[in-house]
Amino acid sequence: MNRENSQSVIENLQAISATFAKDTAERQTRRELDPADFEQLAEAGFLLTGVPAEQGGLWRGIAESARDYTTMVRTLAHGDPCVALVATMHPAVMVYFLGCEQVNDAPQAWLAQRQSVIELARNHWWGTVTSEPGSGGDMLKTKTAAKKSADGIDTSYTISGNKHFGSGSGHADYMITTARRKGAEGPDLFYLKIKDEPWDGSTGCTLASAWDGIGMTATQSHAFRFENFPATKTITSELLGKVSPITAVIGNLLFAAVAMGIADNALSFAKDKLKGKLQNMRAYERVEWNRCRNEIWLAQQAFDGAVRAAEAS
């Protein structure tokens, strides 16, 4: 696929976002995700953000994909920021696999595993449940323990530990996380088949705390306690070191794009409310209005600069 295919997906998302926006008042009261929203996004081609262009997807490397991907999620945020944030997790997570083709410790096995994940990404949503209490959001500071399973499969493990900010819990088919193997120098990346798992602890996954609805109200960013929960380890232990610089860039850009979409909405809403009133505003009100416009303009300049830096990488 070339850039025209990304543009086609963007146009599809613009139409979907416009439909979402018609129900803004109702959507702002939601405390959970609607699966039908994500069915529309999948039909629009958004899942292909997790597939390389040479395999019929949209990923053309960070330099060529950064602008298109951020445009997609910013567009979605115009219609529903919660849906946009959860959808953002799919490409943000898949870059861990898309961004690393060659490793030294298990080159052929990694290529096979990487390809299997890419195939899953065509039709399944990916998310993340990596943050832990006390980690400050640093996935490398995990205290979760990984234990080898008894089935003899090299990548088969169970994990035990506390995780939170699992955005899209109950929606995502698969989630990545980090955990530490006994004796290993650092943590490894694992992925969990999480869709439709009970949250009562019967299979090792217990809902510790449901998302409290603060901020992004309907993202289902729940907290969990895992106890000997099945997990698949990435076959290479080099992955986090190799790909983290790329994932940090694209992840931060995507999340910033959601915030910029919210800012777009706020500015548009304010402009509509102030139509016909600007000439009668008091001096203080005019100063505050111009300050708001300037702050959003400055945010846009910073965002544009970050995208250009990614394109030049």
Predicted regions and their residues:
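Glycine-rich beta->alpha junctions and the first turn(s) of the following alpha-helix
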Residues: A210-W297
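C-terminal helix-coil-helix/basic helical segment that borders enzyme active sites and/or dimer interfaces
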Residues: A25-T29, Q300-S313
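Glycine-rich flavin
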Residues: P35, E39-A42, T49-N162, S167
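A short core secondary-structure module
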Residues: S156, N162-G204
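A generic structural signal for well-ordered coil/turn residues at beta-strand boundaries
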Residues: H124, L140-T142, H171-D173, G186, ...
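Short, structured patches in soluble enzyme cores that scaffold and shape functional sites
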Residues: T130-E132, K148, K163, T178-R181, ...
